[in-house]
Amino acid sequence: MKRLAIYIHGKGGNAGEAAHYQPLFATWSVVGMAYHAQTPWEACQEFPRLFDQLAEGYDDVALIAGSIGAYFAMLSLADKPISQAYLISPVVDMERLITDMMGWARVTEEELRRRGVIATDFGEPLKWEYLCYAREHPIAWRIPTHILYAGQDHLTTRETITAFAVRTGATLTVMEAGEHWFHTPEQMAFLDAWVNRVRDAGEA
């Protein structure tokens, strides 16, 4: 059986990060998806085509995705033949995240609707179009999924991630000292141990 794990990076990442996962999926091919989408509507145009190109000729395809990449993947690839998904710090409720960001920036919904785009001090512009899209396109995800969440994640609350895991039937593992971006040696060791544990459980 030919097996493939497709890695989808988050903001600021790149497809080359997939190399980290090759030792964890030693009998699989592991490849990063080199994408250009910066919005969910762009991802819904681009991701299905890239997935089909990468998955051609494989009998089993798994997904590894992080942060905004996981959000894009869940919106655009829900109907693809994916056997397992491994999501690291996924954004699972974009509407909640945007409204939280509006609160941080002290921007009202009426103001955002009127102005369309508002710059913020924390670097992420608020966009009315994005908020509307998130509301009109909720995630509908039924693929067997394992989630790794950081106790110090500043983008997704524990309440939000727990509710999503319950709704989708996903397993949820929490690294209490972890951050949204898993990058320190301790965090990466925890991530690797998590992959090994849930992968082996899924193959049992």
Language model regions located:
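Short, surface-exposed "cap/lid" segments of acyl-processing enzymes
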Residues: 1-39
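Short coil/turn segments at beta-strand junctions that form active-site/ligand-binding loops
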Residues: 2-3, 58-61, 83, 143-144
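Short hydrophobic segments within beta-strands
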Residues: 6-11, 64, 88, 148
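Short, surface-exposed alpha-helical segments at coil->helix boundaries
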Residues: 15-22, 44, 157-162
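Catalytic nucleophile-loop/oxyanion-hole region of alpha/beta-hydrolase
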Residues: 32-57
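Gly/Ala-rich beta-loop-alpha elbow adjacent to hydrolase catalytic centers
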Residues: 64-73
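Aromatic pocket-lining residues of Rossmann-like dinucleotide-binding sites
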Residues: 76-80
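The alpha/beta-hydrolase serine catalytic core
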Residues: 81-204
